[in-house]
From Swiss-Prot:
InterPro entries: IBD2. Residues 231-249 have a biased composition (Basic residues). One of its GO terms (cellular component) is spindle pole. This is Protein IBD2. Residues 1-14 have a biased composition (Polar residues). Interacts with BFA1. The modification Phosphoserine is found at residues 100, 106. It comes from Saccharomyces cerevisiae (strain YJM789).
Length: 351
C-alpha cells in the first residue's frame, strides 16, 4: 500500500486483492479486502493522527465481474446516459468488467431495458439518472446474480477518496454500508458463517475467524447450559426429598460436606449434652470468659482458618450472640448437621 499525496492536500490509498487460483466467491474476496483495508485504516490513519487534520474519505470498487459501479464510474454514467441511445448504453454498461460479462440478449429484454430508462429519465426531469434508479436497473436486468468474480485476475479495490470519514469509530460502519450496497441481497445469512455484519474495526479484524470460533462458543455455551440444568435438577430433587421427609432446607446451596468440627468449640458433638437444647447456636459458647480488650493480633498469629463467628470470639473474648441469632433467623437451623442418635438420647435422659 502506497499513499499518494494530491495537490489538494488529500491522501489516497488503495488495496488490491488478487485471485491467483481462478474464480472465487465474492464473500471470500470481500473478507480479504476488508481485513487488508482495516489494517491500513487502523495503522496508517490513526497512527499519524489523520483524523485530527482534514477529513478523509473512502471508496469501494469492484472490478472484473462486479455488479455495482464505483462512485467515480457512477458519476461518469450519470453524465453520459442522457446522451446515449439504448445500444450505446448497453455497450457502456458492458464495460464495467473486462470480459463483457453482462449482456442483454433478446429483443424483449432490450425493450424492457429501454422502457425503464425512459421512465426514470422522464420522472426525474433532469440531465442524469439518479444513483438509486441506476442501481435498480443493474440489479434487475444484468446477469450473474450470484455476483462471482469470474475473470482470469479478479480484483477488489478499496479506495478512501469519495466519502468523508469523520472519526475512527466510523470506519467500520462506512465499510459495512459500502459493502452491503454492492451485494445483491445485502449481507446474506450463510450457513457456514463468514462475513455477515460489520459494526466496528475490531469486528473487521476477526471477521474471518468467526467461523472457527462460533462452534467452540456454541459448544461451551451448551455445556454451560447443561451444567446449570444439571445443578438445578439436583437442587430440585434434593428439595423434593427434603420436603418429603418433613425437612425444609432453605440453603441447599451451602456445601454440606464442609467440616465444621475443627473450626470452633460449639461444633463438637461431644459437647452437645452440656447445652440446653438442639438449637445451641442461639445460646452461649461452652466456656465463659470475662470481657477484655479486643486483641486482633490473634488473627495474624492463627494459622488455621476460622469462621466469622470464631474470629469474633477470638478477638473479643465473647460469643457473637447477635450474629448467631441473625444467622439462624436468615438461614435456619436445619443446615447444621444433626447430632448422633446416642447424643440425642443422652440429652433426653438428662432433662
Amino acid at each position: 500500500m502506497t499513499p499518494t499525496n494530491q495537490s489538494s492536500g488529500t491522501t489516497n490509498a488503495s488495496v488490491e486483492v488478487l485471485s491467483e487460483d481462478g474464480p472465487m466467491p465474492i464473500n471470500v474476496m470481500m473478507q480479504e479486502g476488508v481485513k487488508a483495508l482495516t489494517k491500513i485504516l487502523s495503522n496508517q490513519l490513526q497512527d499519524r493522527q489523520a483524523f485530527q487534520n482534514a477529513p478523509h474519505a473512502m471508496q469501494f470498487v469492484i472490478r472484473n465481474g462486479g455488479k455495482a459501479l464505483s462512485n467515480a464510474r457512477l458519476e461518469e454514467l450519470k453524465d453520459a446516459l442522457p446522451k446515449m441511445d439504448s445500444l450505446s448504453l448497453e455497450d457502456e454498461l458492458a464495460k464495467i468488467d473486462g470480459q463483457s460479462a453482462y449482456h442483454i440478449d433478446s429483443a424483449e429484454e432490450k425493450e424492457t431495458f429501454e422502457s425503464k430508462i425512459g421512465q426514470i429519465a422522464s420522472r426525474n426531469s433532469a440531465d442524469f439518472i439518479i444513483e438509486e434508479d441506476l442501481q435498480n436497473i443493474l440489479d434487475d436486468d444484468l446477469k450473474d446474480s450470484e455476483l462471482n468474480l469470474d475473470g482470469e485476475e479478479a480484483e477488489i479495490i478499496f479506495d478512501y477518496e469519495s466519502q468523508e470519514l469523520d472519526t475512527p469509530d466510523g470506519i467500520g460502519e462506512k465499510i459495512s454500508q459500502m459493502i452491503e450496497s454492492v451485494l445483491p441481497g445485502g449481507f446474506g445469512s450463510e450457513e457456514q458463517g463468514g462475513l455477515r455484519t460489520v459494526t466496528n474495526v475490531e469486528d473487521l479484524d476477526v471477521a474471518e475467524e468467526v467461523t472457527d470460533i462460533d462452534h467452540d462458543t456454541v459448544d461451551a455455551a451448551r455445556l454451560h447450559g447443561d451444567g446449570k440444568h444439571s445443578i438445578s435438577s439436583r437442587k430440585h430433587s434434593r428439595s423434593k426429598n427434603s420436603k418429603k421427609n418433613g425437612h425444609v432446607r432453605r440453603h441447599d446451596f451451602y456445601d454440606e460436606s464442609r467440616d465444621h468440627k475443627s473450626c470452633c468449640p460449639h461444633h463438637h458433638y461431644e459437647n452437645l449434652s452440656k447445652l440446653r437444647n438442639y438449637y445451641y447456636h442461639d445460646f452461649e459458647y461452652i466456656s465463659k470468659t470475662e470481657n477484655r480488650v479486643p486483641d486482633f493480633s490473634v488473627l495474624v498469629n492463627e494459622s488455621s482458618p476460622m469462621c466469622l463467628f470464631c474470629e469474633y470470639y477470638m478477638v473479643f473474648g465473647e460469643p457473637p450472640r447477635n450474629m448467631i441469632k441473625w444467622y439462624n433467623r436468615t438461614f435456619g437451623y436445619n443446615r447444621m448437621p444433626n447430632p448422633p442418635r446416642d447424643e440425642q438420647d443422652s440429652r433426653k435422659r438428662n432433662r
